[in-house]
């Protein structure tokens, strides 16, 4: 084996042995037959299936308009966050089916699914959505109740005497 004489030799040796598999993957657009991007999002016990396509900004959740399904403005704000971050409000028609959990968990699941669908439709948005944390699955779920306790951590009342 030949010994390397300088840093330049070392750099040349490193560039010759680099493999194209180690380079960052190129993200491509993923669309179905109707030209829609599809993704699933999860939060707590809720699972949302999200389809997006270019349009005028209509959002349908389980066959109902978003204003009637998510009546609280806070939940609609959670839903719109990914679109506002990437400046794509009113540019996509969004269809969602969501089940499980409560309304807050469902709104978080829709946000997660919508963020993933946006990256499938426009791969260049991935870095800005990832920076905001919208592509990361929130792992927090309800802690189970333990036997010998009133709740997950709360003990029964203790009487010393």
Swiss-Prot record:
Residues 1-21 have a biased composition (Polar residues). One of its GO terms (molecular function) is structural constituent of ribosome. The keyword Metal-binding does not apply. Keywords: Ribonucleoprotein, Ribosomal protein. Coiled coil: none annotated. Transmembrane segments: none annotated. Residues 1-25 are annotated as: Disordered. PANTHER family: RIBOSOMAL PROTEIN S9 (PTHR21569), SMALL RIBOSOMAL SUBUNIT PROTEIN US9M (PTHR21569:SF1). Belongs to the universal ribosomal protein uS9 family. This is Small ribosomal subunit protein uS9.
